[in-house]
Each structure stands twice: as C-alpha cells, then as structure tokens.
Regions:
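Divalent-metal-activated hydrolytic enzyme cores
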Residues: 1-36, 68-92, 103-222
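N-terminal short beta-loop-beta anion/metal-coordinating cradle
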Residues: 19-60
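Short beta-strand segments
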Residues: 41-43, 65, 95-99, 179-184
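Gly/Ser/Thr-rich loops at beta-strand to alpha-helix junctions
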Residues: 45-47, 99-104
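Glycine/charged-rich beta-loop-alpha catalytic/anionic-binding loops adjacent to active sites
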Residues: 58-69
Length: 222
C-alpha cells in the first residue's frame, strides 16, 4: 500500500477537524439535506475539479463529470442527473464547463481507432463537423484545439436546452439558466463564454420544442 494512498485518510482527518473547529454542527447540518443552486457538468480530468475552481463549499454544487463534458441525450447517466437536478433539487443554474488542453477533445481530432471511446468521442467529432469551416480555417493547431473546446461546450449547452425537463421548468419559473464556461489550466481562470440562453431557445424551439409552448413568449407574458 503506497504512502500516497494513506495520506488521503490523514488529509481527511485534518479536514474533518478543521470543519468541526470552525463549526461544531457542520456535519450535522450537512447530513440533513442539500439545496444546491448549481448543476456543474464538467470533464473528468483530475486537474479540473468543480468545487475547488469555483470556491464552493459542500452542498453548494451538484456535480456530474465525464470525458470531455459531453451531454448526450441518449446517455441515461447524464440525462438522469440533469432531470434530478432540475425537478428535485430545483437548481437555478446549469453550467457546462470544458477546459483547454482537454485530452478527450484532442483524441476526437485524432484519426485512430480508440475502441470503446469511439462512440463517446463521436459526439465531439460531430461538433467538429458542424463547425468544420471555422475550425479548418484556424492554422495554429493549438488554437484550433482551444476553439473546439469552446464549441464543444456550446453544443453541449444546446443539448441541455433540448431536454423537456429544462424547457418545462424554464417556462414555469424562469430557471434554470444554462451557462457555458471554459477553465483555462494555463492561468487558473474560468472564462464565461457568455452564451445567449434566450437566443438559443428562440433559434431551436421550432425543432426541439417538447412543451407545445412558445418558450420565450410564455416567460415574458407571465
């Protein structure tokens, strides 16, 4: 058993002691329930941990992570997380966060057989196909990778918006709002891509409307 593994439990002990020293009831209150305002959908990369980069405390962020922060509506795992967060936790914000130097995005741009990863990365290859003209015009390979990371976040945000539970709650309560972020590993900063949530709603509702209502007008006339 490696020393680094044992350190985990030592670190946990110190963390517990520090929390109890700050607030003796911390874990008693934490165990009761959770009321996060945020659903964070991010990459599984070990360098991009949600709570740390957001400066969030336990109970403040509901987190789902996978390779390259993909939201595939045929994937029961991601759709179940989103539906639970929207309908039961009543989150107000859904954040899709990618990061530069993403291995999953780079793998999707590599012409090779990656076995079981192939169907997963196909979602990102589809993003490239949708934006091929723009991406192919970027001569610098690293900048092209960075741009694909951003476009992947954008398209995954759209996949979130396509879900019926997101549409229905937005009409009723004006939430959740979907945001697209990129975490820059080179600087440690979060970049808000400032995705226009309402414009996307308006642009895609003719095809992806699952509620029978005009999303934007229903909200404005309440």
């Amino acid at each position: 058993m490696s020393q680094s593994y044992e350190v985990i439990f030592e670190n946990n002990k110190k963390w517990v002691e520090s929390k109890v020293a700050e607030d003796p009831d911390f874990f008693h209150e934490l165990a009761k329930t959770q009321h996060p305002d945020y659903l964070y959908i991010g990459c599984s990369d070990s360098r991009a941990t949600a709570e740390e980069l957001m400066g969030a405390k336990p109970g403040e962020v509901f987190v789902y992570r996978n390779i390259a922060n993909v939201v595939n509506t045929l994937d029961m795992s991601s759709t179940a997380v989103i539906q639970y967060a929207v309908e039961h936790l009543k989150v107000k914000h859904i954040i899709v966060c990618g990061h530069y130097n993403c291995g999953g995005v780079k793998a999707a741009m590599t012409p090779q057989d990656l076995g079981l990863l192939n169907p997963w990365l196909r979602t990102i290859r589809d993003v490239y196909r949708l934006h091929q003209t723009e991406l192919d015009s970027i001569e610098d390979e690293n900048k092209r990778y960075d741009r694909l990371v951003e476009l992947n976040v954008q398209e995954q945000c759209i996949n979130v918006i396509k879900m019926a539970c997101v549409q229905e709650r937005y009409i009723l309560e004006e939430y959740p709002i979907v945001h697209g972020w990129v975490f820059d590993l080179r600087t440690g900063k979060i970049i808000d891509l400032e995705i226009d949530f309402e414009k996307i709603l308006k642009d895609i509702q003719k095809i992806y409307n699952l509620t029978g209502s005009d999303w934007v007008m229903s909200r404005k006339t309440k």
